[in-house]
């Protein structure tokens, strides 16, 4: 893998370990086709075109390795270098992906974690994530809260507001130096509490007292979870095509 002189390698870890039960489809949702193309390919093509991304690792649901290989070859994606097996949660999939990268990256190389079913990500979001990580040591794509917020008293009602200025949405990409992030996971694994935490990388780092730095986000950068999200993404692609822009 080519390396820039002096600089770190920028590697994207794409999480594709889910099965998409909420979608009710016959295939994992990352393989559902939108305008004839699998969602994961829409996402990978953005990384393929981005000049700052050097390589891609896909952390994949078991049993779909041959399908991934076939469509990566079909669409000529050269940056996909590695495939690791996904885990049952976000954080365990990340850990599997990190362990697979041992010996392939240096401790100072950059790992940008993103979801395979979040194809709305843009070049400016990716580039700001990498910039902030290199300056501060990590970055989390931020989605500020725009709605009025309230806390749950129970499942039926709320009696208290929450100041939206005090909270924010933590989205992907989430970007880190490889060695430091792997060390955080290994400490938690050895301590026996990795699976006791809320299953996200941000929860682990908060538990370790880390300060997380915000990078650029977008209200449009959503994870495709249900059929409404699929319709939204298809409409977005068609709109861009009508403008003569890359569909995604």
Locations of regions flagged by a protein language model:
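Short phosphate-binding loop-to-helix
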Residues: 73-109
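N-terminal glycine-rich phosphate-binding loop and ensuing alpha1 helix
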Residues: 2-66
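Hydrophobic helical membrane-anchoring modules
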Residues: 221-248
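Residue-level signal for inorganic ion chemistry
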Residues: 14, 40, 97, 115, ...
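Short aromatic-hydrophobic micro-motifs that form the base-stacking/packing surface
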Residues: 110-114
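Conserved core of the sugar-phosphate nucleotidyltransferase
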Residues: 120-215, 248
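Acidic metal-phosphate-binding loop of nucleotide-sugar-dependent transferases
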Residues: 21, 116-120
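Hydrophobic C-terminal alpha-helix "anchor/cap" residues
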Residues: 44-48, 72, 101
